[in-house]
């Protein structure tokens, strides 16, 4: 069971302290920091990680990844975690079965509570969420997508970055989503507050470690992002998961990057275990657990 509360009239880029109380319990004291206005433009740090659905051979791997993130920021930055880490992106497969309450409680929330008690996260649906009611109950995402598909695709701005969440699952590979994205990107071209576009979706277009996961719909998304980047001269990235490993590449003729953000808990897709391919747009692929840190500089 997750409760939510809406707090209004908060100032931007401000630290707030909070506790959670029930009739019988009171939590420890936590903090969060509100986002800056896009027009104020500040440097931000973003973590991206995906596919933390539990591997029975390493059931606490997601907790290890979360602790590694916290340790990294403690060692390399001063102050509280949320003073140096602004948000976390998750391109799908948060749990093994989105319809299983215990998976949400035991495999996801309990293993990430130290991180997500102070830093917001923004996921998109993977195939393992199964379009479940529990996902939509637990998440509170921007509701600015196509009418009838709210929280399936959405966008939000943080500093000079526009973050776009998409749904690449079978039944949502539809023209409504592509048209919405095309319109949004067109409106972003001349937005002086936005310098970068980061999109996230679950399925790859090309996967070097696991080619059965390749999805032509993602290729259409990439084409729209490449066209946007060419027209606007604003770099774009798409983050994805589905393949349990890390890959990084760049479109040949465009300032568009593609990053498989590595599995944060699911079983690794090892070299030699699956159909695989060496695609020219990729510079590196590794069969490892991990996460990605993106540092965005103001200006």
Please give the residue ranges for each predicted region.
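Acidic/histidine-rich helix-loop elements
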Residues: 1, 48-71, 98, 137-146, ...
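Histidine-centered catalytic micro-motifs
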Residues: 52, 199-205, 238-248
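Extended active-site neighborhood of metal-dependent phosphoesterases/phosphodiesterases
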Residues: 15-31, 102-193, 212, 216-237, ...
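Conserved, compact domain cores that house catalytic/ligand-binding motifs in diverse enzymes
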Residues: 42-124, 129
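Active-site-proximal beta-strand elements of phosphoester/diester hydrolases
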Residues: 42-56, 160-170, 198-202, 256-263
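Acidic, histidine-bearing metal-coordination/catalytic regions of metal-dependent phosphoesterases
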Residues: 1-59, 71, 75, 79-82, ...
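Conserved acidic residues
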Residues: 86, 195-197, 236
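Short acidic, glycine-rich surface-loop motifs adjacent to enzyme active sites
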Residues: 90-95, 188-210
């Amino acid at each position: 069971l997750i409760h939510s509360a809406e707090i209004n009239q908060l100032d931007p880029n401000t630290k707030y302290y909070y506790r959670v109380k029930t009739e019988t319990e009171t939590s420890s004291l936590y903090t969060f920091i509100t986002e800056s206005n896009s027009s104020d433009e500040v440097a931000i740090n973003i973590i991206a990680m995906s596919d933390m659905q539990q591997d029975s051979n390493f059931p606490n791997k997601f907790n290890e990844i979360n602790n590694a993130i916290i340790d990294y920021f403690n060692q390399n930055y001063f102050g509280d975690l949320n003073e140096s880490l602004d948000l976390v992106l998750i391109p799908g497969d948060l749990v093994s079965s989105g319809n299983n309450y215990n998976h949400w409680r035991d495999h996801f929330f309990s293993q990430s509570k130290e991180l997500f008690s102070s830093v917001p996260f923004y996921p998109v649906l993977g195939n393992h969420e199964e379009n479940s009611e529990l996902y939509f109950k637990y998440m509170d995402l921007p509701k600015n997508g196509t009418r009838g598909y709210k929280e399936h695709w959405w966008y939000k701005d943080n500093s000079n970055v526009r973050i776009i969440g998409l749904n690449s699952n079978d039944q949502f590979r539809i023209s409504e989503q592509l048209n919405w994205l095309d319109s949004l990107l067109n409106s972003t071209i001349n937005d002086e507050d936005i310098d970068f576009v980061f999109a996230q979706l679950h399925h790859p277009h090309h996967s070097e470690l696991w080619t059965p996961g390749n999805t032509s719909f993602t290729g259409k998304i990439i084409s729209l992002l490449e066209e946007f980047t060419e027209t606007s001269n604003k770099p774009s990235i798409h983050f994805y998961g589905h393949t349990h490993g890390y890959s990084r590449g760049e479109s040949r003729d465009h300032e568009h990057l593609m990053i498989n953000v590595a599995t944060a808990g699911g079983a690794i897709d090892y070299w030699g275990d699956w159909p695989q391919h060496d695609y020219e747009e990729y510079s590196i692929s590794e069969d490892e657990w991990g996460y990605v840190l993106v540092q965005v500089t103001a200006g």
